[in-house]
Amino acid sequence: MESNFNTESSSTFTLQSSSETLFSIQLLDFKTSLLEALEELRMRREAEIHYEEQIGKIIVETQELKWQKETLQNQKETLAEQHKEAMAVFKKQLQMKMCALEEEKGKYQLATEIKEKEIEGLKETLKALQVSKYSLQKKVSEMEQKVQLHLLAKEDYHKQLSEIEKYYATITGQFGLVKENHEKLEQNVREAIQSNKRLSALNKKQEAEICSLKKELKKAASDLIKSKVTCQYKMGEENINLTIKEQKFQELQERLNMELELNEKINEEITHIQEEKQDIIISFQHMQQLLRQQIQANTEMEAELKVLKENNQTLERDNELQREKVKENEEKFLNLQNEHEKALGTWKRHAEELNGEINKIKNELSSLKETHIKLQEHYNKLCNQKTFEEDKKFQNVPEVNNENSEMSTEKSENTIIQKYNTEQEIREENMENFCSDTEYREKEEKKEGSFIEEIIIDDLQLFEKSFKNEIDTVVSQDENQSEISLSKTLSLDKEVISQGQTSNVTDNRKSVTTEIKDKICLEKDNGCTEFKSPNNHFVVLDTAIETEKIHLERTRGLDVHHTDVNLEVENNKTSFNSILNETAHNTYHNNNKDVSENEPFKQFRLLPGTREHALEKEITNSDQTKADLDSSLDIKKNPVPCQKYSLRNSSNVMLDDKQCKIKQIQLLTKKSECSILLSKQTSDFLQVCNDTLEKSELTVPCDIVIDHHVSYAAFSANSKLLLKNSDKNVHSMSMLVKPNSSPGGKTMCKNMSDMQNSQFNNCLGYLENTNVNISHLHLNNENSHASQAKDVKTAVHMKTCTETEFSNKKNQIDENQVTEATKNDLFLFVSINERQHTLLNNTEKTESLNDIVSGKMFSEGQLEESHSFHIEPSGDLVNRSGRSTFDLSTSDKKTEKTPVYMNFSDPGPWSKVNHIESQTASSSTPCISLLLKERPLDPSENKKIISMALCKNIGVDDVGKDIGPDTTSINRVADTLNNWSIHPDPKGEPSEEKNAMAKTFYDSSFPTEHVKTKPLISTPLQSHLQAIKTTKNTSGDDDWQSLITNQLNKSENLLSLENDNQPKKRKAEETLEKNNRLK
């Protein structure tokens, strides 16, 4: 019993303890659940407060935008009235001018007839003059022969005279010697006479002495006799005296003997002297005879000299007379030549004046046509504005399932309003730029003077004569106006922006198609101006590959002229890519009325990354984009006025650099933060371009063109900043740059990606600080979508040149995917270069074409961006964009920093196209991303995308037709892509360099950086993809394709005429040169 009791008590105890534990566990669970519920309530309250604040801000912004819209509409109405009045006055003036011109034309015709008659008379006179010239030449030849004979005779006379002078010189020398000898003889004779006188005096003295001595002898003899007598007496004494006397006598004898000897000697000397005198006299007489003979010879020679001199004088007189006659004949001939040249010069001047007047008349007519077309475009825009407001209501309906998507749709509406306002501002600016008769152009004329007008006229002429002079004009403008060309390139990019913007103003949905058709219409008007644009390149390739090649070769410069008159082919293609980016972006904006970009668009218009975020926001309304594409197809029917208007805008924008700069500065004041960052990036890019390309500055504005829908003024201002800061900042804009023609673009991609890292990081940090609602890359899609969004983020980072920031796993994932995509694309690109389109299956061909497009882009240093977009599989872009707009908390700082191109390529080709278009506008890469992204669900869809991307100009209908497995169209597309990648500047990028570029892109080390450089290239493809979307949405218009083919045929005919006219011009020039030579 006790044991049973114990067991029961223990069991009850255990039951009690277990119940207590369960109760405590339940309490703990309840407490934890309570705490969790409270925490959730607190989080929800905070989220609701946050969302309410955001909603309040959005409401305020919408109200402000509505007010701005009303003010802009009022301004628009006033401007429209003023424009109508001005156009009425201008039409009247034009009619008056036309009447006056017709009258002047009749006068000029009469004058030309009279001048033709005068020319005939002059020709007859020329013939007579030629005959006279021939006769004169004969006479001159005869006179020359006579002159030669006279010269020969003269030379003989001169030789004889020279010999005579020599003889005379020798004779005069001898005569001088004779005179000297004669003078010496005279001196010797005088000295001899003096010596004779002296000797005679001495002889007299000696004789006197002899006489005295004789007398003394006589005395002595008498004395001796006396002495002898005395001696005899005195013998002794006398003997002594005798001895003494004898001694004296001996002495005296000795003296006598001496004197006698002296006398003999003197006599001998005198005889000798006399003999010498006789010899001297004989020689003197001989010399006198010689002198007489010489004098006679001299007289004879002088007489001969006189005769020769007289003969020479007569000959010289004859020669002078002959020379005077020759001079007179030459003067007459020169006078005749001068008269003939003057007559020819006057005739040529008259002809040139007439041609210039005719050209002016043609230019005025073309300008009138353009103004008329612009007025029609403006009217169409005014009509389309009403539809735009109605369409916004339908398009702004959010299709996103999440609350964030709803918020994104609301914000997209606000951004659409902002975008519409900004586009209205841009449109007004474009109206000012493009209306030649509006007050805006008058203001510009005041500011920039006649120089801008001349440039505008030149631009119009260039558009009219694109086939004839576009290449030359582009080169000449680049050479003569380097500064203007830079500004023009910026302005042309701006123009492209303005084109996209103006079309956006009329209907954001319709802008892309209208621009494409406008380009086609411009092809009609301008011969093939837009025919040469990348879109038209695709059209040409669809029509005929050979014709396309010819046109591309002929119109490389033309492409440049249309997009950027001053840009060369490389820059032209970048500009075309930028145009395509703009159009795609505009279409995407238009299609995605979600323009949730507004704030990021304001701050990041210049930053490609921010553009992509804005595009991501736009992506939220993919369904709306489809509806917008449908509307855009409808608008394609009216492309001509818009395109012409855009071209007009481009020409005016090129010319109106100053005003565009002012407007850009104004826009920059609003967007100064991001625009400065962009300007730094673009300036860095410009520096890299300067290192790699001679025309890097021009390519930079092309990069700027990517944000056309934002505001061309802002881009131009940024481009200014870029140009100014190009030396300092050389890095970040390389992403946008598409160095189509130069291998330097390849290095640019690398260098710029490297150099952009620091600056772009700064820009990203700045973007974070700016509180811009960057469409973050956070995607609320499936895990695959999230990874794709990460890839997109990394791709965006790669575009923005922030490799360091994107070293994350996401970035690595993107790099891996990019490298794979790059490998595939590079292989496709190689196949493109080889044009091995037949090897590809239908599906593979479509993919290869997509890859080819991307590969071509890669060849231009932008392959990697497209590859980065390949990485992104089709995701719920709507969810992505919806969350990206509002999921700021979920978004990483890196993603915030990277306003990277959100190129979301969905498997659905059309949604891809929409996304790509929106992204291409921002970064120009997404279109390639579409082409490079994962295979669409159906190969037929791929084919559709490819053919339509290529056939954007050809027509959406053609794209719809190409939806089937059309291998020929695919081959054409591949050829077009190959040609397009190669043609931008065949000199700039040889095939080897392109292969090297493909290899570099193939390297896994560079994928992220290279993706940066690709965006521009992708934009044209995206625009084509937009066209494809529109074609898919609407049935193809056969008429549109026929129009395109007709335009292509016309352009071919014009080119053939141009080629035919060139040899004629050459022949005419050669004939003129021959005539001048004959004269």
Curated annotation (Swiss-Prot):
Pfam family, one: CCDC73
Keyword presence, Oxidoreductase: no
Coiled coil residues, start to end: 59-210, 236-384
Residue numbers spanned by region Disordered: 1052-1079
Keywords for the protein's UniProt record, in alphabetical order: Coiled coil
Residue ranges, compositional bias (Basic and acidic residues): 1061-1079
Stored InterPro entries: CCDC73
Protein name: Coiled-coil domain-containing protein 73
Gene expressing this chain: CCDC73
